[in-house]
């Protein structure tokens, strides 16, 4: 009995603080009788209670939001003594239209907040409900603003992406809340992405929405390696014609089932318009790649637009300056920009799927003239050693030297059958010159993957439609034009600096066996030919470069373009965007 009384006493002692705490928080469930006479101290206590008991995602934004409330003594951000829902309605209006950015309102708890707001207007809320509404609005507001400014998904979660993007910090949180108090509508309008590319994708999304309810019969795939050639009959032809009529490449004909039985010139012209838009090979045949693109639903095309708008949010053009280079790995092209306008365009060769070109942002800091090529270990093991087993003359033909412990050796003395991942002690270096795999010019930029832009000794590759053929580096079609782009644009009044740059360009030309162009270059070549040979040029300023992956974009002519997802990254990002929420 004594033990029983002892445990009763212990239970009472433990329970007293809990009962006391529950009693002190009982006002949380009190209905606020008159919003005009709102008890601010009770609301602040309710907000503190809400922040300490609700499990929001443990990201930096949540931490900074809590810190903002703490430093402002848990004052309400959205609810004041005289309840004015204008600011709340303004935020909800923007959230209701978040679909223009590829997300859905309920990913921001739109229904829950709307329900609380309606109750706020038509009934009386408890202090806890007011606190919940206030903190929920704050989280929604910051997530929305930060998402538009920096992206809703961190690209770092994907293996292929190696971009260090900006994130919402304490300064951003403070700025956003200060703007909320004074200029909410202007701030929400100002934070919308406004680059030409982004706005164009939004406009094209609206255009594709017009077709969302349009239906068309699936076009049956052809048998393996089969194609439909110009002038041939195929039962799929009228279905292809019908699909092209929906999006306007082909003029509507109600008798299409009989009008289009043969693959004729009119259909070819319409089909080529579609193939240009989707980056398909232009020829006088229809293959399964074309049929697969035609069979994509309009919802799938819209999803492709949404995914690529998110990619644009990751790297705002404003962070790159007025002059930069953007390699679109998915399109296998390079665009050099000046003031948001394409100044130079060229084809490139990129890494195949098993050797993906890393997606990153950096700065080109130097040009290497007549580079040597140190062969990567993986290529030695997987490719060159296997060739050498059958043909050791490969090394001489390709001007490749073999080294062991720093000394050059005769490759014919090596047992190449013993080379594998665990045993590869040799270093291979290809001599500089016209036969070098890197061509005559290499563009170095800082990165952790030893990749770079470079010329090539195999120019024919640029004629191919599929140029995802490299081991990860990017081969450029027009290296000399890219060199000229990398030089600073000077005002004509700086004649001495212009002459100096022209001479440097001529030194590059002379070093790769091209004729010099400038008067200064010609005079220097005559008077002092030795100084005309150079090995490297350090750029000043450095040129920003983005290795990007846009499977949907607007071309320089203002036309929307879709590209094959060669690295299968669209579906990964789409899943993350769909799964995005506040928790």
Residue ranges and their predicted role:
Residues 24-168:
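Cationic-aromatic interfacial patches
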Residues 150-154, 168-191, 197, 270:
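A sensor for short, sequence-defined functional sites
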Residues 10-17, 74, 84, 379, ...:
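A generic structural signal for solvent-exposed, polar alpha-helical segments
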Residues 4-11, 55-56, 81-82, 86-91, ...:
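Hydrophobic alpha-helical segments and their boundary regions
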């Amino acid at each position: 009995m004594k033990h029983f009384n002892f445990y009763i006493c212990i239970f009472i002692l433990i329970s007293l603080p809990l009962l006391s705490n529950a009693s002190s928080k009982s006002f949380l469930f009190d209905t606020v009788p008159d919003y005009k006479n709102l008890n601010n101290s009770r609301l602040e206590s309710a907000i503190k209670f809400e922040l300490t008991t609700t499990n929001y995602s443990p990201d930096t934004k949540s931490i900074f939001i809590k810190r903002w409330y703490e430093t402002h003594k848990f004052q309400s951000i959205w609810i004041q003594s005289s309840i004015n829902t204008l600011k709340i309605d303004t935020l909800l209006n923007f959230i209701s239209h978040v679909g223009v950015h590829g997300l859905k309102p309920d990913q921001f708890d739109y229904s829950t907040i709307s329900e609380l707001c309606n109750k706020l207007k038509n009934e009386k809320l408890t202090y806890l409900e007011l606190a919940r509404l206030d903190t929920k609005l704050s989280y929604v507001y910051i997530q929305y603003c930060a998402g538009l400014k920096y992206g809703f998904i961190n690209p770092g979660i994907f293996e292929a992406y190696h971009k260090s993007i900006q994130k919402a910090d304490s300064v951003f949180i403070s700025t956003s809340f200060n703007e909320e108090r004074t200029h909410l509508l202007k701030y929400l309008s100002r934070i919308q992405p406004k680059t030409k590319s982004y706005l164009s994708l939004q406009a094209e999304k609206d255009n594709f929405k017009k077709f969302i309810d349009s239906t068309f019969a699936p076009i049956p795939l052809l048998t393996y390696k089969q194609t439909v050639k110009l002038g041939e009959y195929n039962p799929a032809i009228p279905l292809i014609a019908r699909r092209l009529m929906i999006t306007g490449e082909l003029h509507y004909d109600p008798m299409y089932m009989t009008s289009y039985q043969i693959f004729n010139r009119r259909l070819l012209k319409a089909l080529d318009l579609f193939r240009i838009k989707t980056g398909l090979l232009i020829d006088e045949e229809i293959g399964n790649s074309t049929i697969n693109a035609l069979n994509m639903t309009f919802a799938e095309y819209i999803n492709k637009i949404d995914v690529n708008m998110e990619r644009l949010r990751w790297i705002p053009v404003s962070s790159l300056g007025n002059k930069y280079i953007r390699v679109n790995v998915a399109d296998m092209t390079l665009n050099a920009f000046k003031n948001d306008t394409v100044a130079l365009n060229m084809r490139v060769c990129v890494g195949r799927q098993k050797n993906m070109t890393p997606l990153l942002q950096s700065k080109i800091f130097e040009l290497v003239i007549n580079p040597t090529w140190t062969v990567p270990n993986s290529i030695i093991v997987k490719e060159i050693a296997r060739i050498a087993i059958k043909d050791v003359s490969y090394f001489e033909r390709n001007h490749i030297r073999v080294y062991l412990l720093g000394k050059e050796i005769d490759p014919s003395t090596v047992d190449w059958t013993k080379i594998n991942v665990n045993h590869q002690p040799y270093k291979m270096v290809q001599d500089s010159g016209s036969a070098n795999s890197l061509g005559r010019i290499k563009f170095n930029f800082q990165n952790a993957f030893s990749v770079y832009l470079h010329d090539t000794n195999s120019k024919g590759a640029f004629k191919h439609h599929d140029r995802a053929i490299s081991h990860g580096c990017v081969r450029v079609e027009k290296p000399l034009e890219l060199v000229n782009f990398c030089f600073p644009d000077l005002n004509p009044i700086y004649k001495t600096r212009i002459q100096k740059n022209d001479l440097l360009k001529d030194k590059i030309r002379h070093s790769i066996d091209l004729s010099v162009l400038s008067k200064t270059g010609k005079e220097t070549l005559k008077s002092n030919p030795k100084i005309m040979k150079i090995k490297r040029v350090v750029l000043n300023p450095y040129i920003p470069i983005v290795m990007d992956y846009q499977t949907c974009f607007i071309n320089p002519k203002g036309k929307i373009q879709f590209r094959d997802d060669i690295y299968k990254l669209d579906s990964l990002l789409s899943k993350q965007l769909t799964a995005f929420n506040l928790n």
